[in-house]
A protein has these predicted regions:
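C-terminal alpha-helical interaction appendages
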Residues: 1-104
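Conserved small/polar residues in nucleotide/adenosyl-binding loops
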Residues: 115-117
Length: 117
């Protein structure tokens, strides 16, 4: 039996947050998918999610996550207003699936990201 960094009840929160982050970064902020993946995996947030830090797994929205990742990695404030989006884009589902895969496999986002390039 594999021991995960956080309990299964938080997986849906992490999936929704990362799905929303991918969707917002790519479709609203117009950050390329490759660039966002690179920023995410080098940010402290990828490791904090991997470790199950409650503030990251259940305490942030995807939009907040993108703003903090961009500030941490690029030292730049995003001045883009968030939009209410009730549809689920392809980018959303990519982030959603990656969050689950990371939790299930216990691989780091950096390791998963290396397979991407």
């Amino acid at each position: 039996m594999m021991i995960h960094a956080y309990q299964e009840i938080y997986v849906n929160n992490a999936q929704t947050m990362l799905g929303d982050a991918f969707d917002y970064a790519i479709n609203t902020c117009h950050i390329s998918g490759d660039d966002f993946v690179k920023m995410f995996v080098v940010s402290s947030f990828s490791e904090r999610i991997e470790n199950g830090e409650p503030a990251c797994v259940a305490g942030k929205s995807g939009i907040e996550l993108v703003h903090e990742i961009v500030f941490e990695t690029m030292q730049k404030e995003l001045n883009i207003e968030s939009e209410v989006n009730y549809s689920r884009s392809c980018e959303y589902w990519i982030g959603w699936a990656v969050a689950y895969y990371q939790w299930y496999s216990d691989r780091s986002f950096k390791e998963i990201g290396r397979a991407h390039v």
